[in-house]
């Protein structure tokens, strides 16, 4: 089993958040490693999509930044490729993920699953206005 946190390696805030994710995993017995994110700056996104036979059409929508959206998907897809090529389970965490408990072992599910406890609007309201920490 491999556990990755997708990290924009040249973005300090992404790296800091990913380190928190790694430490939170370690606190619950899960070793997580950085997975360098695909970005428009470090990857030819269109070429990567063509090589993998991924159609761009589903990524075009009014409000998204197309290349960023495609790059984020490609980061996840790259982790899935590892799972397929190495015939192993892979857990993929966003850089701002934070584990508050152990991940069930074994999961008894093979495929794609979302593990989380969304706040559903019950998050802590920040006491300031403006940019804050991740």
What are these regions (language model features)?
Residues 1-93, 97-134:
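An acidic/histidine-cluster motif and surrounding catalytic segment
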């Amino acid at each position: 089993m491999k556990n990755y946190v997708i990290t924009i390696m040249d973005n300090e805030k992404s790296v800091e958040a990913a380190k928190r994710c790694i430490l939170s995993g370690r606190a619950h017995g899960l070793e997580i490693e950085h997975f360098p994110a695909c970005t428009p700056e470090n990857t030819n996104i269109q070429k990567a999509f063509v090589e993998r036979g991924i159609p761009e059409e589903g990524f075009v929508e009014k409000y998204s930044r197309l290349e960023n959206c495609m790059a984020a998907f490609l980061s996840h897809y790259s982790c899935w490729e590892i799972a397929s090529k190495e015939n192993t389970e892979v857990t993929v965490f966003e850089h701002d993920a934070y584990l508050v408990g152990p991940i069930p072992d074994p999961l008894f599910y093979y495929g794609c699953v979302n593990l989380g406890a969304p706040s559903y609007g019950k998050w802590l309201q920040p006491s300031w206005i403006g940019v804050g920490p991740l």
